[in-house]
Amino acid sequence: MSSNISPNVLLLMTDAQRRDTLGCYGNRLVRTSAIDSLAAEGVRFTEWHVPNPLCMPARASLMTGHYPSSHGVRTNGMNLGDALPTIAELLVNAGYWTASVGKLHLNFWWADKPGYSQEGRADWSVGRRRIDLPYFGFQAVDMAIGHNEDSWGPYAEWLAEVCPEGHALMQPENALRVPSGALCTWDSALPAEVHCTNWVADRTIARLRTRDSDHPFFVVASFPDPHMSYSPPEPYCRMYDPTDVSPPLQREGELDRMPPHFRAYYEGTGYCREMFEDKTLNMLPAAAHTDLQWRDMRAHHWGQVTLIDDAVGRILAVVDELGLRENTVVIFTTDHGALMGDHGMHMHGPFHYDGQLRIPAIWRWPGQFPAGPGPPRDARSYCRPSPAARAMARSLGGARECGLCRR
């Protein structure tokens, strides 16, 4: 690759994915051949940590190169403002064409009334049909908002056109078999070909094929899964036997040594208590889960990951088909992890445990990162947002680092 040609950038991103769901990070049961190949051909980060284990703060940090204390998105529900440039805006200024497909979540989803958020359900419920462009520096946007059975926006509207019964098929009452009772865990009746994961892959491929070839590109393919609900379609929902899954990490009496909000969440009386009190959501607190239910939750999570891996494989095949491999940086990561029973907790929140803080991160850059036989090359990075955005801005065709946090 010529050093004076700006490389393309393809950012493959998931939501709430544990690093131990990938073969390249030591899981010997889950099938993730496409992502594992990225690690074998590039660099696998072993100490890549999130600055905040919630979606909006973590995503704002990745896109701005700032910590939550600087960009202001300290928790979910706080919109990212325009005071700081995003990496997409910096790259546009450096001559890049930019596109985002899938989940962005830089605006709040659950505003009470329209006008606060382009991504909010309230706006889409009163007639919004597109995202105003450019959106945080992205010149093209195909957005998926929400998760699985609770989705709205462009993906949900596309699904209603091609599969009118799709929304109903995703609901737990239409599960393919009786659920185990684990939190938000069931076998989705939605056909895999119209699942959001495959829609993100299809739209990403379409964007790559129709890109502005006169400019290098920055394309984000952001899968809303494997965030809960843990409801993959066939064949992924039955791909892994819960009895083969390792139990969560728990120590007897450990909650007794932790601050009170840990036990309150465990019992369903603290963080997220409104969801646990709403019986229509079938949201069980962690204390109500059995060992087999934790394993069943993880088995479904693995199924979601393999569905994503198949989608990643399709995208990477098109990168090769279009002759883009040698001049394209491919990055795979997630916004944060998930606890899934570790330390008696599920989901993710104000608990600083490895399961939700230490995440997968893989970079493939032909000609810059050596590839060859043997195990993946490892690198260390103790916090994600600033080093990643700075390195990207330094390396990609002279995009200036102005506005990026240097701490």
Give the location of each predicted region.
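Formylglycine-dependent sulfatase
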Residues: 1-407
